[in-house]
Amino acid sequence: MREIDQRIDQYSESDLPDFCRKPTLVLGIGNILFGDDGFGCEVVDYVEAHYPVPEAVCLLDAGTGVRKLLFTLCLSTARPQRLLILDAIDAGRSPGEIFELDPAEIPPVKLDDFSMHQLPTSNLLRELQETCGVEVRVLACQTGPLPEEISQGLSKAVSGAVPQAAEWLVRNYFSCTAAPQADLCPSA
């Protein structure tokens, strides 16, 4: 671990990726090849197509590669102040319902997602929040039944929730109080 810390310390802040240096990081995650699981990625695409993204926000479609990004954040010398995860979750609600979660509230069925390295992504989110001081939230959408085989595209209910989630994101993370930007904030 000390060797990793030494390698990270030799980088200047300008060498770090944007997602480490911006005050707010928004990650859309999921697998677009498994129906509603692609919700987070679709929200990122929708926001990029319909809204200007403030300079203080890094908006990424992380797909199924979220684990590597979270490891990088945990080990980095610079981190965002806030991290929002956009994800599809089965929490027993109505399909297409949008709701907010703290990392500690992630349903047990999600704890083993992307478990290639046997360390659940939710543990990394808690580590970022509790040890690294990053404010972490999850904006989730209740999925319909996920396909057992490859099936690209969201269900009607979840597809209808994409603009609603995008509006929530813009209102809560692109606003003047969340990330002051000259192009979004009126002059005082």
Predicted segments with their positions:
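N-terminal catalytic or cofactor-binding beta/alpha core of small enzyme domains
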Residues: 1-134, 138-143, 152-164, 170-188
